């Protein structure tokens, strides 16, 4: 069945999959952002000076401070560093995930999925292309971390051995620099693996979401409506109209729509009468039927909400257009005449070229 899934996923399929948590996301990229942000914060703002200051105060007071006061002070300093650190980690993990998912929350992924306990499905995942990809990725990561460790060892081995004669503060400063250097070197060595994994994950996700032609057709019917039902609906609309109304539509110069609730037909033949007349006057379902029939017989339908409402309020069928509205109606008639004449002028030279 999967071999028949050759069509690209539709926008609706991608949105539904994102709600289920099945959209493209590179977990390693999220972990890399989280690690980099956390280490950068600890190296930049983490310090033992405040903790050491508390100890100095206690010693200066001849240990008169109670254990409760000391614990409370240490707890306050810990919160001062821990809360921003946790918020930063939350942002560094959530923002890349939301960007990859198009800011769609996977609400349906929170529901329990009993099919995940199916041993057959587990066996399929065990021998899938994604498992092969993860195995190769793990080996590449291991190689890149070994390379990063070798680079850091060759570059910082002097600093490492110099700590044998250093004090506590000096050792803390050196290890802070070494930690940042090790993380940055590992990320730099693993950058290519990260990009390759993201590309492979994207193509595997798109492959899993591919649809067969029947699924695409079924989804189009759900979104746009079944063509057979739409055709039947048009036929019903036609049956709503009487033969007199159909005749009035055919003789109209144009139909002014609102765009679905009101349709007003304009009859205008200067050789018979100099003033336009209201030939069609329908609302709601009959208005939709008028539009459908006008499009069928080739009568222009112009959407002008303001004019349609005004004519509907002030006129009835077979009324002559009043002086208050005649300017707007004549403007539409002149514009329509110009458009039709321009179309004829384009067609005429083409016919002459064919004859020559």
Curated annotation (Swiss-Prot):
Keyword Cell inner membrane: yes
UniProt-listed Pfam families: Bac_export_2 (PF01312)
Keywords noted in UniProt: Cell inner membrane, Cell membrane, Membrane, Transmembrane, Transmembrane helix, Virulence
Bilayer-spanning residue ranges: 29-49, 72-92, 132-152, 179-199, 261-281
Protein role: Involved in a secretory pathway responsible for the surface presentation of determinants needed for the entry of Salmonella species into mammalian cells.
PANTHER family: FLAGELLAR BIOSYNTHETIC PROTEIN FLHB, SURFACE PRESENTATION OF ANTIGENS PROTEIN SPAS
Disulfide pairings: none
Principal subcellular localization: membrane
Record protein name field: Surface presentation of antigens protein SpaS
GO CC annotation, single: plasma membrane
Matching Gene3D superfamilies: 6.10.250.2080, secretion proteins EscU
High-level lineage: Bacteria, Pseudomonadati, Pseudomonadota, Gammaproteobacteria, Enterobacterales
Record bears the keyword Transmembrane: yes
Family, per entry: Belongs to the type III secretion exporter family.
Membrane topology: Multi-pass membrane protein
Organism per entry: Salmonella typhimurium (strain LT2 / SGSC1412 / ATCC 700720)
Protein's GO biological process: protein secretion
Entry's localization field: Cell inner membrane
């Amino acid at each position: 069945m999967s071999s028949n899934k050759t069509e690209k996923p539709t926008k609706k399929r991608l949105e539904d999959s994102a709600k289920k948590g099945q959209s493209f996301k590179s977990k390693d990229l999220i972990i890399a952002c989280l690690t980099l942000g956390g280490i950068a914060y600890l190296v930049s703002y983490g310090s033992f000076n405040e903790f050491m200051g508390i100890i100095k105060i206690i010693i200066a007071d001849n240990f008169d401070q109670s254990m409760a006061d000391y614990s409370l002070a240490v707890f306050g300093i810990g919160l001062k560093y821990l809360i921003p650190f946790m918020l930063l980690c939350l942002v560094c993990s959530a923002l890349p995930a939301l960007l990859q998912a198009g800011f769609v929350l996977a609400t349906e992924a929170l529901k329990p999925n009993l099919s995940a306990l199916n041993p057959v499905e587990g066996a399929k995942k065990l021998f899938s292309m994604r498992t092969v990809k993860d195995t190769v990725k793990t080996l590449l990561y291991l190689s890149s971390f070994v390379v990063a460790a070798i680079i850091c060892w060759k570059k910082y081995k002097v600093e490492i051995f110099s700590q044998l004669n250093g004090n506590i503060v000096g050792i803390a400063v050196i290890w802070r620099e070494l930690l940042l250097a090790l993380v940055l070197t590992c990320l730099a060595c693993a950058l290519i693996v990260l990009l390759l994994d993201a590309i492979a994950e994207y193509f595997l996700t798109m492959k899993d979401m591919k649809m067969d032609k029947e699924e695409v057709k079924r989804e189009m019917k759900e979104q746009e409506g079944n063509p057979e039902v739409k055709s039947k609906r048009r036929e019903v609309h036609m049956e709503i109209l009487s033969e007199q109304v159909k005749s009035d539509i055919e003789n109209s110069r144009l139909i002014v729509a609102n765009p679905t609730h009101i349709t007003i037909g304009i009859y205008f033949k200067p050789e018979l009468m100099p003033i336009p007349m209201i030939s069609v006057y329908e609302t709601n379902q009959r208005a939709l039927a008028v539009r459908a029939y006008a499009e069928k017989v080739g009568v222009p339908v112009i959407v002008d909400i303001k004019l349609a409402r005004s004519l509907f309020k002030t006129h009835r069928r077979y009324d002559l257009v009043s002086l208050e509205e005649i300017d707007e109606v004549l403007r539409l008639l002149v514009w329509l005449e110009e458009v039709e004449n321009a179309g004829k002028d384009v067609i005429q030279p083409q016919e002459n070229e064919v004859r020559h």
